[in-house]
């Protein structure tokens, strides 16, 4: 008889403990009901990136002096700089400049150390493609400025994200 009573007491204690845990979880769930939704309907809603966002690199061909500083400071030696030495003026002439964004880690060293400021980071972050070879941008593709998200009337921009309010 005594083991049966202790068994019922253990069962009762376990039931109360389980009810307490369920109540705690329910209270956490209720505390989240008055928060803004975190989910963003991506193609139709886009977050405005911060001022220091590291997006696609923009390249200005006319400013580049082919010094290859960007290649030396890149942790993966990514930018490909082809140049030719002009013997009559003893100066380098840039022939081709390309970056493969499938490999780029967007560290920003090339932009930071460029002596002529011919490289800059843009707010563009959409690189979705079916072929990875399309991510290899030459100087013509790097020279195009991305369309601003703010100016696109088909996209609803979200200025204040719930994540930035909490942090």
Swiss-Prot record:
It comes from the Eukaryota. GO terms for cellular component: chloroplast thylakoid membrane. Binds 2 [4Fe-4S] clusters per subunit. It is found in: Plastid, Chloroplast thylakoid membrane. Keywords: 4Fe-4S, Chloroplast, Iron, Iron-sulfur, Membrane, Metal-binding, NAD, NADP, Plastid, Plastoquinone, Quinone, Repeat, Thylakoid, Translocase. One of its GO terms (biological process) is photosynthesis, light reaction. [4Fe-4S] cluster 1 binds at residues 64, 67, 70, 114. It catalyses: a plastoquinone + NADH + (n+1) H(+)(in) = a plastoquinol + NAD(+) + n H(+)(out); a plastoquinone + NADPH + (n+1) H(+)(in) = a plastoquinol + NADP(+) + n H(+)(out). Disulfide bonds: none annotated. GO terms for molecular function: 4 iron, 4 sulfur cluster binding; iron ion binding; NADH dehydrogenase (ubiquinone) activity; quinone binding. The keyword Lipoprotein does not apply. Its cofactor is [4Fe-4S] cluster. NDH shuttles electrons from NAD(P)H:plastoquinone, via FMN and iron-sulfur (Fe-S) centers, to quinones in the photosynthetic chain and possibly in a chloroplast respiratory chain. The immediate electron acceptor for the enzyme in this species is believed to be plastoquinone. Couples the redox reaction to proton translocation, and thus conserves the redox energy in a proton gradient. PANTHER family: NAD(P)H-QUINONE OXIDOREDUCTASE SUBUNIT I, CHLOROPLASTIC. This is NAD(P)H-quinone oxidoreductase subunit I, chloroplastic. It comes from Arabis hirsuta (Hairy rock-cress). The lineage of its organism: Eukaryota, Viridiplantae, Streptophyta, Embryophyta, Tracheophyta.
């Amino acid at each position: 008889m005594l083991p049966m009573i202790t068994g019922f007491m253990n069962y009762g204690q376990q039931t109360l403990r389980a009810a307490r845990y369920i109540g705690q979880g329910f209270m956490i769930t209720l505390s989240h009901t008055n928060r803004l939704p975190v989910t963003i309907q991506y193609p139709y809603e886009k977050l405005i990136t911060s001022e220091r966002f590291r997006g696609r690199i923009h390249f200005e061909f006319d400013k580049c002096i082919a010094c290859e500083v960007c290649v030396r400071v890149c942790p993966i030696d990514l930018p490909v700089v082809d140049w030719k030495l002009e013997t009559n003026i003893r100066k380098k002439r840039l022939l081709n400049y390309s970056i493969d964004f499938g490999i780029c880690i967007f560290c920003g060293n090339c932009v930071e150390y460029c002596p002529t400021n011919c490289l800059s980071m843009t707010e563009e972050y959409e690189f979705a493609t079916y072929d990875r070879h399309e991510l290899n941008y030459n100087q013509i593709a790097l020279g195009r400025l991305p369309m601003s998200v703010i100016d696109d009337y088909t996209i609803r921009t979200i200025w204040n994200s719930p994540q930035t309010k909490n942090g």
